[in-house]
Curated annotation (Swiss-Prot):
Presence of the UniProt keyword Ion transport in the record: no
Its job: Possible disease resistance protein.
Keywords: ATP-binding, Nucleotide-binding, Plant defense, Repeat
Highest taxon of the lineage: Eukaryota
Region listing for Disordered, in residue ranges: 36-84
Organism in which the protein naturally occurs: Arabidopsis thaliana
UniProt protein name: Probable disease resistance protein At4g19060
């Protein structure tokens, strides 16, 4: 398979330094995005010819936002709009990390202290998945309301929209605030600016700053008195939020994000980012930082790989697979593979994926295990 060979040849050598790791991971992303986009487009064209005007949706690969560039020149393919919904596959590992997050949220249930936490790590290491698992945890649901998930990247964001205003609007929409209110707030800001200009009053505050201040005030009013949990997923510099969320001295600055989060009611804000410097600027102390590293456990990475294999097995074949395990994907089956040399295969997967769960899932899509006619499971020789 040409796509698989090209993909694997790019990441076949072992990484020797942190800089090489970063470069190699970037190559994994760009190569897979380009090749998978071609394959996916061809597949959709074939599907359209078979099913008329039907279109297929729901593919969660990182290629769905591959067009265009961000304001600072980084390709949008690096960002994906996320949601609070649990992934459609089993979540492997994260036992200690999940316990840490739950402890952060639940250790002092009656505490009224406002707290922030940043989860930082490489692309594809599982920051979003970890947060989704905790966000949907029943114990967490019982303590926090409202719970709001904010994907810092949104496909719906207009090119001329101020990134700060866009994020606050999306939080307010989650709280039930309608777009009509946003129009009213913007009109108010424009009218106030116009009146002061006509009166000859010198003012440095722009219309957008006035609009942002009003939106943050509206957010504050909607959250005051509530034990809220807010997740800001995939924060980049492009979002232009780099201010301490718990800095009470900044509460007087009307355009500061912390103004929108009432203090003293036990609210919590969790953010994820690939940028540790930015994360520290937002959450402050080292103790508010949780680093997520690539997997060192070959067994859990192997399980992630097997779960992602796009194998569909009929009833007869499933009968032959006595140790097959059903996944959340309905008719998909994740077989337990017992290769002749398991240690070698698992280490090979670890080397090729760099310990990154997303890379392991990508490899599973282009180099899956196969089920032969008699129900035995084997690996493709080219892997």
């Amino acid at each position: 398979m040409d796509i698989a060979k090209k993909f694997i040849s790019e990441i076949d050598d072992k990484l020797e330094s942190k800089s090489e790791f970063d470069k190699e991971l970037e190559k994994i992303k760009s190569s897979f995005n380009e090749e998978y986009e071609k394959w996916s487009s061809g597949k959709q064209r074939g599907s359209s010819s078979k099913h008329g005007n039907q279109s297929t949706h729901g593919d969660s690969s990182p290629t769905r936002n591959s067009s265009g560039s961000s304001k600072k020149g980084r390709p949008k393919a690096n960002r994906v709009e996320t949601s609070s919904e649990l992934p459609d596959h089993l979540i492997r590992g994260f036992i200690n990390e999940k316990l840490f997050l739950k402890n952060f949220l639940l250790k002092q249930k009656e505490s009224e202290e406002f707290k922030t936490l940043a989860i930082v790590g490489k692309y594809g290491v599982g920051k979003t998945t970890l947060c989704q698992a905790v966000f949907n945890d029943e114990d967490v649901k019982q303590v926090y309301f409202p719970r709001i998930w904010v994907s810092m990247y949104s496909k719906e964001t207009k090119e001329d929209e101020d990134p700060k205003i866009d994020v606050v609007k999306r939080i307010l929409r989650s709280l039930g605030v309608e777009d009509e209110m946003f129009k009213h707030i913007k009109t108010e800001a424009e009218e106030e600016k116009s009146i002061k200009d006509e009166a000859g009053e010198r003012e440095e505050e722009t219309v957008k700053e006035k609009e942002l201040a009003r939106l943050l005030y509206a957010l504050h009013l909607n959250l005051i008195g509530k034990k809220y949990l807010i997740v800001l997923d995939d924060v980049w510099e492009d979002n232009e939020w780099d201010q301490r969320l718990d800095d009470e001295k900044k509460q007087q600055e009307k355009s500061h994000l912390s103004c929108g989060f009432p203090k003293g009611f036990g609210g919590k804000v969790i953010m994820t980012s690939r940028d540790e410097r930015l994360a520290k600027a937002i959450v402050g102390e080292e103790e508010n930082l949780q680093r997520l590293f690539p997997r060192s456990d070959a067994e859990s990475l192997w399980e992630i790989y097997i779960d992602a294999v796009p194998t569909k097995v009929d009833d007869a074949a499933a009968t032959n697979l006595g140790d097959a395990v059903a996944t959340n994907a309905g008719d998909a089956v994740a077989p337990k593979v017992n290769p002749r040399y398991p240690g070698r295969y698992k280490q090979e997967l670890m080397d090729k994926s760099c310990g990154i769960p997303l890379a392991a899932r990508m490899l599973a899509k282009i180099e899956p295990v196969k089920v032969d006619e008699i129900g035995n499971i084997d690996r493709k020789q080219s892997f």
